[in-house]
């Protein structure tokens, strides 16, 4: 049996007190209490062997709703309860099946390498009470999963050469451990990193011209530059069809905040956010990291003069990546 005792603890009591005593505030209080009760009932659907003392919001992710599930026992881990956004990932079963294959394979590789601290180096998802092979539950049209919380770990938002090198090593090691995965993973977001598809989308956007900007000189200049690069941008897809370039298990969302660092920042502990793990070309992961990390501005920066390519981050990430990935890459790759 699962012993679950719910205590309304910070930050929710402070939030409740701050809402005031008006009818509208009272309704909000009731909704918060109902949310806590609902979250507790969802946790109970997983094979948790600890006493839950608190559930509170965690992180600032844009895709999934995430909560920290705090347990009372010192010898038991805390957990992370997460609602999967099935509008972004409509095939939840495929997402979790991919994750199960990947995390199981990584765990086996780490054990073979002599790693004993598995908890901090690979995500662990809990099965449901009703089905030991199922890693998510559906409640009122929403899909939830529960994983072990990795403590003594931090995420980073900013990138410097040191963290870029560590990220390169980590993502390269991630791919290396999965280079021999025997199972074919599903494509959780169709054509997510398919450059041929993306270029066709761009052409269609030009035809529709919804914003009425197609004839602007700056837009025409950008389209001309993209046209010059289109053949190189789609080379991977062509080589793949010719059988010259393999698709591998890739993360497909290689940002620096999709990995956990040790508290002192000296080591990458674990690659996280595995919803987009799927077959792709290795350039997807390599280039996707540099797309954000090596830029001096945000990806939606309208002032082009602020956008520069950071050679120091590029070189550090490349050295780190090749140090881990060189062992399995083909000469063409």
Residue ranges and their predicted role:
Residues 283-326:
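Active-site activation/catalytic loop segments of kinase-like enzymes and analogous catalytic loops
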Residues 33-54:
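Juxta-kinase regulatory segment immediately upstream of eukaryotic protein kinase catalytic domains
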Residues 76-98, 104-186:
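ATP-binding pocket architecture of kinase catalytic cores
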């Amino acid at each position: 049996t699962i012993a679950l005792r719910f205590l309304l603890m910070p930050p929710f009591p402070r939030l409740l007190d701050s809402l005031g005593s008006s009818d509208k505030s009272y309704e909000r209080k009731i909704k918060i209490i109902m949310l806590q009760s609902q979250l507790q009932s969802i946790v109970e659907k997983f094979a948790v062997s600890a006493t839950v003392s608190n559930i509170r919001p965690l992180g600032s992710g844009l895709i999934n709703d995430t909560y920290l599930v705090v347990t009372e026992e010192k010898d038991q881990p805390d957990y992370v309860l997460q609602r999967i956004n099935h509008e972004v990932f409509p095939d939840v079963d495929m997402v979790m099946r991919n994750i199960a294959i990947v995390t199981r394979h990584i765990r086996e590789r780490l054990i073979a390498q002599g790693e004993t601290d598995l908890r901090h180096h690979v995500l662990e998802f809990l099965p449901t009470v009703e089905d030991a092979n199922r890693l998510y539950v559906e409640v009122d049209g929403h899909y939830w999963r529960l994983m072990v919380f990795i403590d003594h770990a931090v995420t980073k938002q900013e990138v410097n050469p040191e963290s870029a090198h560590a990220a390169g090593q980590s993502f390269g090691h991630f791919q290396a451990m999965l280079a021999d995965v025997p199972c074919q993973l599903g494509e959780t977001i169709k054509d997510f990193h398919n450059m041929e598809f993306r270029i066709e989308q761009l052409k269609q956007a030009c035809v529709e011209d919804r914003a009425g900007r197609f004839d602007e000189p700056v837009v025409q200049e950008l389209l001309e530059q993209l046209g010059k690069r289109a053949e190189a941008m789609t080379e991977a897809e062509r080589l793949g069809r010719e059988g010259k370039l393999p698709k591998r298990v890739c993360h497909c969302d290689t940002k620096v905040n999709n990995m956990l660092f040790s508290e002192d920042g000296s080591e990458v502990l674990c690659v996280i956010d595995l919803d987009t793990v799927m077959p792709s070309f290795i350039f997807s992961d390599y280039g996707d990291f540099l797309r954000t990390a090596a830029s001096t501005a945000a990806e939606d920066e309208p002032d082009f003069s602020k956008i520069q390519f950071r050679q120091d981050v590029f070189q550090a990430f490349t050295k780190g990546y090749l140090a881990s990935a060189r062992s399995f890459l083909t000469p063409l790759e």
